[in-house]
UniProtKB/Swiss-Prot annotation:
One of its GO terms (molecular function) is RNA polymerase II cis-regulatory region sequence-specific DNA binding. It is found in: Cytoplasm; Nucleus. Residues 81-90, 337-353 have a biased composition (Low complexity). InterPro entries: Fork_head_dom, TF_fork_head_CS_2, WH-like_DNA-bd_sf, WH_DNA-bd_sf. It holds the Pfam family Forkhead. One of its GO terms (biological process) is regulation of DNA-templated transcription. Keywords: Activator, Cell cycle, Cytoplasm, Developmental protein, Differentiation, DNA-binding, Growth regulation, Nucleus, Phosphoprotein, Transcription, Transcription regulation. GO terms for cellular component: cytoplasm; cytosol; nucleus. This is Forkhead box protein O. Its main location: cytoplasm. Residues 63-80, 221-230, 256-265 have a biased composition (Polar residues). It comes from Drosophila melanogaster.
Length: 613
């Protein structure tokens, strides 16, 4: 028995698929395709395949029969043809190269009526696409069914038709008017892309036409393609600086079109090299030329503007001093910055260092300027330039104080640093003192005039006398005066006594004239035909005022008398009430006393009658 177990167990020589197991144990040639392929981390599933890769033809084989509206053979052939056409496409899905929209298109096209409901599209997917065969249940089909609904409502190639029957889902059909090729998303169709493209095309055509016509910017600058037409036309025909071509720019200034920071074709104030801080003196450009006519025109223009602004500023200062308004506190003392102090020290050490040859109007610009100098090209030092030699250089320092606006003329001393001989310095000092004296005299005269005007305005109106006023033959028409007063409104009370108008109507016109008697007054004045002079009118007004005062006094006296009478009556009433109360009290007391006396008397015993026994 045991010997039988010592024998070797029988081995199977074939497997289920017909291959011998001995063959599997031999040396098999390893396929190179099974080795791990290296790829970048940016590549996601599925891995890109080579271009000459051919997929098997039996990828989509239909094993189940469709319903009566589906044709399995036609749909399978159409899907295979579509897959063969898209073998080298970059789009890779788990079921192949076809997208959801392509699958829905094949499903609807395979139906006999060329229309399917949503449930029939789901059924076609499960029956004809191997990837969805095991995903037909409700748990695993939620994702791809949602994608199908999304694609149906998104693409224009699908159209929804209402079903005739009640309670049935709608039909989905292919839109015959849809454009072939890649479908356009509906969200993009709402944008006005056509109009936008037309406008861009017109702008490009204009730019090209202007370039071909030879329109270039300043210094032969070509505008960039992204710049608009207006940016390439930086010409100033109205400006006197650019007309005639006499004004040339410095080569140190470059255009923004040649820089990396901007694509504009305008000039940039940034110098190309040797950048200096703002407080440094700018370089004297020798090639900056200007014609003599332009220079004279600029001098006249800036001179007249400076004179007008100076006069306005002086008038404002005079009025503020005359009106007695609180003036602003004086500005703090000027303290030059550190770099300015260093420059002044260098200038003091070498005062003649900048005495080089200068041409034209080459002067150093002010370091800190007022608001007028910043906004306008003001020539405040033109008068000083006329008295200077060509080699002299003048610098004006006007510090900017906080919380205060510096005036255009500054009305105070200029600190002139003259880097020339002592003779020019003395001449400038004398001229400066003369200007200060003239300004002080002008401001004093303006201040006196303003004070005089304010004093005249402060006088009361009662002191104004018409007799001292030279009126001449000035006459007043009462009718026109009344009509004018009535035109302002019917709430005016005009009091004019009629005694001076007509002596026969003294009794009827003794009282003041109210607004109801204006028509009678106009008739009387028109019938009389006499005109009142200003003196008579003044006398009438005085009489009216006196009458009004008398009436007011009478009314006040009457009110006072009535008040006194009322108080006396109240006192009398109080006295009467007190006396009546006393009488009533005494009467009640006497009656009570009599009653008590009667009750206190002893009773009298009377004898019985005679008939009583």
């Amino acid at each position: 028995m045991m010997d039988g177990y010592a024998q070797e167990w029988p081995r199977l020589t074939h497997t289920d698929n017909g291959l011998a197991m001995d063959q599997l144990g031999g040396d098999l040639p390893l396929d190179v395709g099974f080795e791990p392929q290296t790829r970048a981390r940016s590549n996601t599933w599925p891995c890109p395949r080579p271009e000459n890769f051919v997929e098997p033809t039996d990828e989509l084989d239909s094993t189940k029969a469709s319903n009566q509206q589906l044709a399995p053979g036609d749909s399978q052939q159409a899907i295979q043809n579509a897959n063969a056409a898209k073998k080298n496409s970059s789009r890779r899905n788990a079921w192949g190269n076809l997208s959801y929209a392509d699958l829905i298109t094949h499903a609807i096209g395979s139906a006999t009526d060329k229309r399917l409901t949503l449930s029939q599209i789901y059924e076609w997917m499960v029956q004809n696409v191997p990837y969805f065969k095991d995903k037909g249940d409700s748990n695993s089909s939620a994702g791809w069914k949602n994608s199908i609904r999304h694609n149906l409502s998104l693409h224009n190639r699908f159209m929804r038709v209402q079903n005739e029957g009640t309670g049935k889902s709608s039909w989905w059909m292919l839109n015959p008017e849809a454009k072939p090729g890649k479908s356009v998303r509906r969200r993009a169709a709402s944008m006005e892309t056509s109009r936008y493209e037309k406008r861009r095309g017109r702008a490009k055509k204009r730019v090209e036409a202007l370039r071909q016509a030879g329109v270039v910017g300043l210094n032969d600058a070509t505008p960039s393609p992204s710049s608009s037409v207006s940016e390439g036309l930086d010409h100033f025909p109205e400006s006197p600086l650019h007309s005639g071509g006499g004004f040339q720019l410095s080569p140190d200034f470059r255009q923004r079109a040649s820089s990396n920071a901007s694509s504009c074709g305008r000039l940039s104030p940034i110098r190309a090299q040797d950048l200096e801080p703002d407080w440094g003196f700018p370089v004297d450009y020798q090639n900056t030329t200007m014609t003599q006519a332009h220079a004279q025109a600029l001098e006249e223009l800036t001179g007249t503007m400076a004179d007008e602004l100076t006069l306005c500023n002086q008038q404002q200062q005079g009025f503020s001093a005359a009106s007695g308004l609180p003036s602003q506190p004086p500005p703090p003392p000027y303290q030059p910055p550190q770099h300015q102090q260093a420059q002044q020290q260098q200038q003091q050490q070498s005062p003649y260092a900048l005495n080089g040859p200068a041409s034209g109007y080459n002067t150093l610009q002010p370091q800190s300027q007022c608001l007028l100098h910043r906004s306008l090209n003001c020539s405040c030092m033109h008068n000083a330039r006329d008295g200077l030699s060509p080699n002299s250089v003048t610098t004006t320092m006007s510090p900017a104080y906080p919380n205060s606006e510096p005036s255009s003329d500054s009305l105070n001393t200029y600190s002139n640093v003259v880097l020339d001989g002592p003779a020019d310095t003395a001449a400038l000092m004398v001229q400066q003192q003369q200007q200060q004296q003239q300004q002080q005299q002008l401001s004093a005269s303006l201040e006196g005039q303003c004070l005089e005007v304010l004093n005249n305005e402060a006088q009361p109106i009662d002191e104004f006398n018409l007799e001292n006023f030279p009126v001449g033959n000035l006459e007043c028409n009462v009718e026109e005066l009344l009509q004018q007063e009535m035109s302002y409104g019917g709430l005016l009370d005009i009091n004019i006594p009629l005694a001076t108008v007509n002596t026969n109507l003294v009794n009827s016109s003794s009282g003041p004239l109210s607004i109801s008697n204006i028509s009678n007054l106009s008739n009387i004045s028109s019938n009389s035909g006499s005109s009142l002079s200003l003196n008579q009118l003044q006398a009438q007004l005085q009489q009216q005022q006196q009458q009004q005062q008398a009436q007011q006094q009478q009314q006040a006296q009457q009110q006072q008398q009535q008040h006194q009478q009322h108080q006396q009556q109240l006192l009398l009433n109080n006295n009467n009430n007190s006396s009546s109360s006393l009488e009533l009290a005494t009467q009640t007391a006497t009656t009570n006393l009599n009653a008590r006396v009667q009750y206190s008397q002893p009773s009298v015993v009377t004898s019985p009658p005679s008939w009583v026994h």
